[in-house]
């Protein structure tokens, strides 16, 4: 047995030999290789997933170092998906890594998503892209889990999975929900579930203030500004990583459950 094979013995002993085969055969797409997506990709690789497709077009920036796995002083200005792919191959040389150096949009949505994925993990922060992907996957019965905003939070114990229609105190998920209802025909009944899982947090957000302090209230100066890396929510790796790990845990459980169900039906 090679060192690479030995590296995943623990995963097989956790899920069982038969279920682990399903994980090794799985093809999972990660959209957005950033504060959450890098941890998603890492967890998938260390779980022995057989094929991973990474979709992103960003380069590593110094402002990413606080929360992104690929962000090091030595990797600044390098292409994120390439840095992540090199890391995955060093973890699991047998993993097939596909790179799509693009941002998901109207012109490439079909090309990016119509690839026989077992699961799509939406870790991007574009509302437009998230809405398109959720709608596309739902109507084609492609399993997808979307991830809400991980900024402005300090308590990883508050991270959980709920139906996208039922998130609280998550501006990103709320905006996504609004777009899905207004542009994609999702139910406007506030009690109706979307049947799309969302990783989110119940923690009240910490907003940066112009004087350098932090408050639970959004200041007038912050309210009209774009919440980007330089002036938006602060973030820490132990929260963004938790979002990613919880998403991967659910995805692997779903893949294993589907495999077991199909085996029982034989």
Task: Describe the predicted segments one by one.
Residues 1-29:
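N-terminal charged helix/coil linker that caps or initiates catalytic domains
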Residues 2, 115-119, 124, 129, ...:
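Glycine-rich phosphate/adenylate-binding loop
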Residues 30-32, 55:
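Conserved N-terminal Rossmann-fold NAD(P)-binding element of oxidoreductases
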Residues 36:
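Hydrophobic/small residue at the entry helix of a nucleotide-binding pocket
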Residues 49-92:
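Glycine-rich phosphate-binding loop and adjoining beta1-alpha1-beta2 segment
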Residues 63-70, 153-163:
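Acidic/polar active-site rim loop that often engages polyanionic ligands
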Residues 100-109:
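Conserved SAM/SAH-binding loop
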């Amino acid at each position: 047995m090679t060192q690479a094979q030995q590296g995943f013995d623990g995963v097989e002993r956790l899920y069982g030999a038969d279920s682990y085969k399903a994980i090794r055969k799985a093809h999972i797409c990660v959209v957005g290789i950033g504060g959450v997506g890098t941890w998603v990709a890492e967890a998938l690789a260390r779980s022995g997933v057989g094929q991973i497709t990474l979709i992103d077009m960003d380069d590593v920036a110094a402002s990413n170092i606080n929360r992104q796995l690929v962000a090091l002083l030595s990797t600044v200005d390098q292409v994120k998906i390439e840095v992540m792919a090199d890391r995955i191959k060093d973890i699991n040389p047998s993993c097939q890594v596909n790179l799509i150096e693009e941002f998901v949009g109207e012109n490439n949505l079909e090309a990016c998503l119509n690839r026989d994925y077992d699961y799509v993990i939406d870790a991007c922060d574009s509302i437009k892209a998230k809405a398109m992907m959720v709608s596309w996957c739902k109507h084609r019965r492609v399993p997808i889990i979307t991830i809400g905003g991980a900024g402005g939070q300090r308590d990883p114990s508050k991270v959980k999975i709920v139906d996208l229609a039922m998130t609280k105190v998550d501006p990103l998920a709320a905006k996504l929900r609004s777009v899905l209802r207004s542009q994609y025909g999702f139910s406007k009944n506030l009690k109706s579930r979307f049947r799309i899982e969302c990783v989110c947090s119940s923690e009240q957000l910490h907003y940066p203030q112009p004087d350098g302090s932090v408050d639970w209230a959004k200041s007038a100066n912050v309210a009209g500004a774009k919440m980007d890396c330089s002036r938006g929510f602060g973030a820490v790796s132990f929260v963004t990583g938790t979002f990613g790990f919880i998403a991967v845990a659910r995805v692997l459980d779903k893949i294993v459950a589907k495999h077991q169900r199909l085996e029982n039906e034989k």
